[in-house]
Amino acid sequence: MSLENFGNFLTLDEKHSFIKKYFKEFYTKDFKLFASKDKHYRTRAELSFYHENDTLFYAMFDPKSKKKYIIEYLDFADEKICAFMPRLLEYLRQDNKLKEKLFGVEFLTTKQELSITLLYHKNIEDIKSNLENLSNILHINLIARSKGKKLIFKTENLRQTLNIQDRKIFYEFNNDCFIQPNTAINEKMITWVCEILNTQKRMDLLELYCGYGNFTLALAPFFFKILATEISKSNINFALKNCELNNTTNIHFARLSSEELSLAIKKEREFFRLKDIRLDDFNFSHVLVDPPRAGLDKSVIDLIKKYGNIIYISCNPMTLKENLKELSLTHRVEEFALFDQFVNTPHLECGVFLSKV
């Protein structure tokens, strides 16, 4: 979430200075700062296409003024994206069927791979052979989308390997998953959590908003058992596959919202999706939450504040502060970390570790 409502904070030092004052009622010790490289850090990029005089350009549009900016190079994008952008554009410019009613492109990379998604205002079935040729000639994993339709050439799944405390963690996911778009910072976030856990007495972990298992797989060795919840069926399927990739057997995934889990733990409602999981078998010493921008609602806060230790990863300092007002009634902030996910922008990712008073 952007800090631009509070000022033009772009550098990590400026963000740090603001956050120290903004959260001073909860935390007065030293913050841990995690910087990112300032170029080629972002693994996801979305661009529009601009058509003029029968040719094609990458473009971005200012959301307020609607002013158009022709894009030739993205210095923040992963090197694989930067290298592929001109090759793709040259190919599209030479194929009238492919460039007709093409309005957008999404690039996604991992350390190993790259995929692109082309977005159309027409029936992509009519250009299926052209799209297949593009995928084959440029040797690219390609997805094409138009209203109600999706075509996949080669594969839409990407493989990723993260290095966490001298361990390699293997993942597979696709473009529909929520992905931390700065791989180096993602590794630093997970490592920060692991370093905290190294000093803790641990039993079982409850994780909410687990996605495809980004944190879950890396934290599995620290706990006897993990219960991880997520509402996306696709994410759950990838999480299960990622357990197989890492030979991990102590994670139990449940396709439940956080609100539904709260009802289940309080025994106010039974869920068929929990039929193979005995909640009473878990002894949660820690909770990990990585919520969307809206933060945690009251039912989730009431649930997690029962447990001794809370790890809160936040993409929105404003909702984090609101949630801490409630959580600080029962817990104390022990560690606070700042992750410069998007360099030279007002965005900031925070990590907070709380323990019960």
Swiss-Prot record:
UniProt GO MF annotations: rRNA binding; tRNA (uracil(54)-C5)-methyltransferase activity, S-adenosyl methionine-dependent; tRNA binding
E.C. no: 2.1.1.-, 2.1.1.35
One Gene Ontology biological process: tRNA processing
Cellular-component GO terms for this entry: cytosol
Keywords: Methyltransferase, S-adenosyl-L-methionine, Transferase, tRNA processing
Catalysed reactions, semicolon-separated: uridine(54) in tRNA + S-adenosyl-L-methionine = 5-methyluridine(54) in tRNA + S-adenosyl-L-homocysteine + H(+); uridine(341) in tmRNA + S-adenosyl-L-methionine = 5-methyluridine(341) in tmRNA + S-adenosyl-L-homocysteine + H(+)
Catalytic residues as annotated in Swiss-Prot or TrEMBL: C315, E349
Binding site for S-adenosyl-L-methionine: Q180, Y209, N214, E230, D290
Pfam family, one: tRNA_U5-meth_tr
Superkingdom classification of source: Bacteria
Role, per record: Dual-specificity methyltransferase that catalyzes the formation of 5-methyluridine at position 54 (m5U54) in all tRNAs, and that of position 341 (m5U341) in tmRNA (transfer-mRNA).
Annotated family: Belongs to the class I-like SAM-binding methyltransferase superfamily. RNA M5U methyltransferase family. TrmA subfamily.
Annotated protein name in UniProt: tRNA/tmRNA (uracil-C(5))-methyltransferase
Organism: Campylobacter jejuni subsp. jejuni serotype O:2 (strain ATCC 700819 / NCTC 11168)
The encoding gene: trmA
